[in-house]
Amino acid sequence: MKLRVRLQKRTQPLEVPESEPTLGQLRAHLSQVLLPTLGFSSDTRFAITLNNKDALTGDEETLASYGIVSGDLICLVLEDDMPAPNLPSSTDTEHSSLQDNDQPSLAATPSQTNIPDEQGTDSSQGQATPFDAWTDDSMEGPSQNVEAESIQDAMSMEEVSGFHPLEPMLCNETEDGQVPHSLETLYQSAGCSNISDALIVLVHLLMLESGYIPQGTETKAVTMPEKWKSSGVYKLQYTHPLCEGGFAVLTCVPLGNLIIINATIKVNGGIKNVKSVQLQPGSYVAAGVEPGESAAKVYKDLKKLSRLFKDQLVYPLLAFTRQVLNLPDVFGLVVLPLELKLRIFRLLDVHSVLALSAVCHDLLIASNDPLLWRCLYLRDFRDGTVRGPDTDWKELYRKKHIQRKEAQRMRHAMFLPSAHPIPFCPIPVYPRAYLPTSLLPPGIIGGEYDERPILPSVGDPVTSLIPRPGELPGQFRPLRPRFDPVDPLPGPHSLLPGRAIPNNRFPFRPGRGRSADSRLPFL
């Protein structure tokens, strides 16, 4: 195996004579051969890394287990230059590989980027998410279908305090004692009777995470395909959206304490062998576990198995299938493995996820994955309710979002200021004591005035306090009818023609249109 070794900005070729070298053999070869040629002592202590940061540990492990192939670049870091030793992480499989021409690669492995933890991305919870796809006229109005109890639950859910850690969504994100929800559901529905069955269930889930679609089942990650095991032999058949016209078949045969997984493809009626992997069930499945036990107690080292199985079988199988079908090279977000798409979509808000789903059919399928919507639901709503395996997480998210918006609308209405009160009237208007009102004209005996002679004016209490011209200012006007039947306009300034007005030069001058009354001197 030929490798390239970089130390302090200097790169040297190195040839390891062993066919399947381990990390310890590589370390010894570097100390005896490479370090003296670079001017260092063979006793110099160093760390082997792939990214100049994370040291590889486990001298008994083979280089292939870390994804190192011929032509790869490895970096040496002297211990004097390292501030603190780093534990192996999910970035251990990062490598900038120069793969041989006889082994084409489709895309980088999902472990090449260490996505930061999204547990602190819950800041969008206090904001109203303005995605129009769920508030258009095509959707049902929230005020018509949301019950009061659900609204109260949504309001109380927002007031829950505390930290709610997210569960792992993929197998390469798990730690000891953790399994993805999809693996728990799949394991409980499979009815495993031995550790070989449990390992095949895990292999099936890894194929699903890589974007393969199983044949023989309509659901994606709830149940195992039909006739997946027969007479001690396991057989799984898949298709892939990027390999139309080709079928991938996994034949798993238990041999002693090993399981041999042979990958073949069916293209144009022919069958071609692609790859073969040997797995030891005892390394990833705990022995002596009773049926019905939690999957977290059954499986172990899921991160390691996910890296090995995908790097050594899944992605080479996908690349070889495209090569056999003579398909051109593809690039971009659409052709990324499904697990990388899910990890990208998980970092987005729901409005952006729905916008991406409207771009093309492939992104629509990826954005409708139930694993993604379960993760988004737990991130945005922090609901700890245990739900069944057939839960529609996208529909549940939509209902909870509508309830939250309705609860926010109700909470906003509760704190709105009340309408302005009616101004205080200093002079009350008394209701009429006798109903109906007298039918007599105003001013006639027995009319409105005689019913309440104490009040200055019942009809207009405000203007009654304003003295008219020629009257003395006071609290009340003189007690008299509002309208005089003889002189309808009482007061000293009558404007009717023929009336006597003080300071008039012609007090008895007839008005226009009528003669003077000749009977006035005799009266």
UniProtKB/Swiss-Prot annotation:
The modification Omega-N-methylarginine is found at R432, R452. GO terms for molecular function: protein heterodimerization activity; protein kinase binding; ubiquitin binding; ubiquitin protein ligase binding; ubiquitin-like ligase-substrate adaptor activity. The ubiquitin-like region mediates interaction with PRKN. The proline-rich region is important for protein-protein interactions. The modification Asymmetric dimethylarginine is found at R519. A motif (RFDP motif) lies at residues 482-485. Residues 180-325 are annotated as: Important for dimerization and interaction with PSMF1. GO terms for cellular component: classical Lewy body; cytosol; glial cytoplasmic inclusion; Lewy body core; Lewy body corona; Lewy neurite; mitochondrion; nucleoplasm. It comes from Mus musculus. Residues 1-88 are annotated as: Ubiquitin-like. Pathway: Protein modification; protein ubiquitination. Residues 98-128 have a biased composition (Polar residues). Residues 330-376 form the F-box domain. The lineage of its organism: Eukaryota, Metazoa, Chordata, Craniata, Vertebrata. Gene3D superfamilies: 1.20.1280.50, 3.40.1000.30. Substrate recognition component of a SCF (SKP1-CUL1-F-box protein) E3 ubiquitin-protein ligase complex which mediates the ubiquitination and subsequent proteasomal degradation of target proteins and plays a role in several biological processes such as cell cycle, cell proliferation, or maintenance of chromosome stability. Recognizes and ubiquitinates BIRC2 and the cell cycle regulator DLGAP5. Plays a role downstream of PINK1 in the clearance of damaged mitochondria via selective autophagy (mitophagy) by targeting PRKN to dysfunctional depolarized mitochondria. Promotes MFN1 ubiquitination. This is F-box only protein 7. InterPro entries: F-box-like_dom_sf (IPR036047), F-box_dom (IPR001810), Fbxo7 (IPR047118), PI31_Prot_N (IPR021625), Ubiquitin-like_domsf (IPR029071). It comes from the Eukaryota. GO terms for biological process: autophagy of mitochondrion; lymphocyte differentiation; negative regulation of G1/S transition of mitotic cell cycle; negative regulation of lymphocyte differentiation; negative regulation of oxidative stress-induced neuron intrinsic apoptotic signaling pathway; positive regulation of mitophagy; proteasome-mediated ubiquitin-dependent protein catabolic process; protein K48-linked ubiquitination. Keywords: Cytoplasm, Methylation, Mitochondrion, Nucleus, Ubl conjugation pathway.
